[in-house]
Amino acid sequence: MKKTYEPETKSTIEQVIDVFNDYIRTSTHFELLWSDKVGYIYISIDNVQGSIGDTGCCVVNCGEELFDKLVWELAVDIMEEVGHTIDPTEATLLERREIERRIHPYLEQLPAYQDRLQRVFTREK
């Protein structure tokens, strides 16, 4: 069994990876790996236990899915730093503005995903 994405799907996934590359490499909360068997795998990391997290592990099927996961992780990181809680769905207006400000450079490079940012505040799938 060898995973093959449609060329357009693979291109959109790799575009998201390229834009978020520094964040992907430096985050301690998840890992993004390639498997010849299933494709890109997103693995959440439990930093307390030092192991794979119980939830959040999946095969990446499209660029939008990966974008949503990365933006969610980034928003949680921002909330950990400046928020009153770590959950972006509970962000105050000021916290939302800070999240939007910090995610803006990524969105500038991925204009097709502009409409997806608000999902972080509603946890819409």
Language model features with spans:
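Negatively charged, low-complexity tracts enriched in Asp/Glu with abundant Ser/Thr
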Residues: 1-31, 110, 117-123
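Context-gated lysine
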Residues: 2-3, 10, 37, 69, ...
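Acidic, low-complexity, intrinsically disordered interaction modules
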Residues: 29-105
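Acidic, proline/glycine-rich low-complexity IDRs
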Residues: 94-125
